[in-house]
């Protein structure tokens, strides 16, 4: 998923729509670089269509985020995995897998969030990209509709932030 990130300002030489899809390209590169595995691979389809990038309830592209969260959870639930490795997109692609695992293993799920940013923004904060709200969503905090979709949540005392360089 790429809609959770608002990164076009980082690439002023690219047309806005092309820059916005940067996370999708990164996901494709990760897929090429990742070692092949005998484990099942499941891909969540992601639309590359760019419509009007609208902010709703404090989240840019909120409708796409809700749609893709549902699609990811549907794929996860169809396969009922015991473990999940997620490659691609921006930080919020981790929300469905982490919350699924939190529901499956309620007493044995912890998150080590390795990122330059804590991703603990909330809807209504100045920055409206959902990728900056990913960890709070895993904690069960944030947009009510999105949080209701999520099968579980991880307790804040079972969360470790690693690699922070800025507190955004």
Segments predicted by a language model, with ranges:
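Conserved alpha-helical scaffold segments that buttress catalytic/binding sites
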Residues: 1-168
């Amino acid at each position: 998923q790429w809609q959770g990130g608002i990164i076009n300002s980082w690439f002023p030489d690219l047309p806005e729509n092309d820059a916005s899809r940067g996370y999708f390209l990164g996901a494709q590169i990760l897929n090429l670089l990742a070692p092949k595995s005998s484990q099942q691979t499941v891909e969540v389809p992601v639309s590359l269509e760019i419509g009007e990038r609208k902010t709703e309830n404090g989240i840019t592209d909120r409708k796409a985020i809700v749609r893709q969260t549902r699609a990811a959870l549907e794929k996860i639930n169809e396969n009922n995995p015991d473990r999940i490795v997620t490659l691609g997109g921006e930080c919020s692609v981790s929300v469905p897998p982490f919350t699924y695992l939190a529901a499956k293993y309620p007493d044995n799920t912890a998150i080590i969030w390795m990122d330059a940013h804590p991703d603990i923004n909330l809807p209504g904060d100045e920055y409206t990209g959902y990728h900056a709200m990913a960890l709070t969503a895993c904690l069960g905090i944030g947009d009510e509709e999105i949080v209701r979709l999520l099968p579980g949540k991880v307790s804040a005392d079972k969360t470790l932030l690693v690699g922070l360089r800025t507190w955004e």
